[in-house]
Each structure stands twice: as C-alpha cells, then as structure tokens.
Amino acid sequence: MDLQKVLPQMILLLLFLNLSPLGGHSHPLGSPSQSPEQSTMQKLLELIREKSEEMAQRQLSKDQGPTKELLKRVLRSQDSAFRIQERLRNSKMAHSSSCFGQKIDRIGAVSRLGCDGLRLF
C-alpha cells in the first residue's frame, strides 16, 4: 500500500470519528427536562381528550334513543306498505275472477266455475 494514499484517508477517518457524537446518538440542544410551557400544554391536551371522549359518550347515548324511535317508525311504515301491497294483491285476485269479456256457454251454475262461483274472500 502506498503511504501517500493511505495517510489522508486515515486522517479523515480520525477526524470523522472525533467529531461524531458518542454512542452514535444525537444529543438535543435543550435540557432533558420538560419546560413549564410544555407540561401545561400536555395537561391541556389531556383535558381536551377527556372532554372529547365524554362528549362522544353523551352523543352516543343521545343517538341511541332517537335511533330506537326511528327504527320503530321505519318498521311501522314497512308494515303499512306490506298491508297495502296485500290489499292490492287481494283486490286484483278478486277482479280476475269476474266474467267480464269471457264466454260462459259450457260453464253451469252447478259446477261453481261461472261468475261469482269462486270467491277468494
């Protein structure tokens, strides 16, 4: 190895090691203890978090009451819609049993297949 090439590299390495922090960790410029402003900010942040959690719990408890009422209303409206559909189906079936527009030459009153012979309700 050539001493002229190795010597500058060794000097740079020693200079770099001398300037690097101990243990390879950075050292902050401020003191390790918290400042009074920082501790008050931490307390305020904790208070805000607690208040927001309390408000969320209150809102959740308030929302559950109207949700039950809303669910009951929706079920009632669905039930009434179902009843209306049933009435429409029944009325259509009753109208389809009429004799309007059909020939009834061979259907007699004894067989109960003529007009008003078969009633669904």
Swiss-Prot record:
Induction: Up-regulated in cardiocytes in response to stretching for 48hr. Induced by lipopolysaccharides. GO terms for biological process: blood vessel diameter maintenance; cardiac muscle hypertrophy in response to stress; cell growth involved in cardiac muscle cell development; cellular response to mechanical stimulus; cGMP biosynthetic process; cGMP-mediated signaling; coronary vasculature development; endothelial cell proliferation. The precursor molecule is proteolytically cleaved by the endoprotease Furin to produce brain natriuretic peptide 45. May undergo further proteolytic cleavage by various proteases such as DPP4, MME and possibly FAP, to give rise to a variety of shorter peptides. May be cleaved at Ser-91 by the prolyl endopeptidase FAP (seprase) activity (in vitro). May be degraded by IDE. During IDE degradation, the resulting products initially increase the activation of NPR1 and can also stimulate NPR2 to produce cGMP before the fragments are completely degraded and inactivated by IDE (in vitro). Disulfide bonds join 99-115. Residues 1-26 form the signal peptide. SMART domains: NAT_PEP. GO terms for cellular component: cytoplasm; extracellular space; perinuclear region of cytoplasm; protein-containing complex. GO terms for molecular function: hormone activity; hormone receptor binding; signaling receptor binding. The record marks 76-77, 91-92 as: Cleavage. Keywords: Disulfide bond, Hormone, Secreted, Signal, Vasoactive. Expressed in the atria and ventricles, but at much lower levels than NPPA. Expression levels in the ventricles are slightly higher than in the atria. Very low levels of expression detected in the brain, hypothalamus, lung and aorta. The keyword Cell membrane does not apply. InterPro entries: Natr_peptide, Natr_peptide_CS, Natriuretic_peptide, Natriuretic_peptide_brain. PROSITE patterns: NATRIURETIC_PEPTIDE (PS00263). Pfam families: ANP. Belongs to the natriuretic peptide family. PANTHER family: ATRIAL NATRIURETIC FACTOR PRECURSOR (PTHR14066), NATRIURETIC PEPTIDES B (PTHR14066:SF10). This is Natriuretic peptides B. It comes from Rattus norvegicus (Rat). The gene is Nppb.
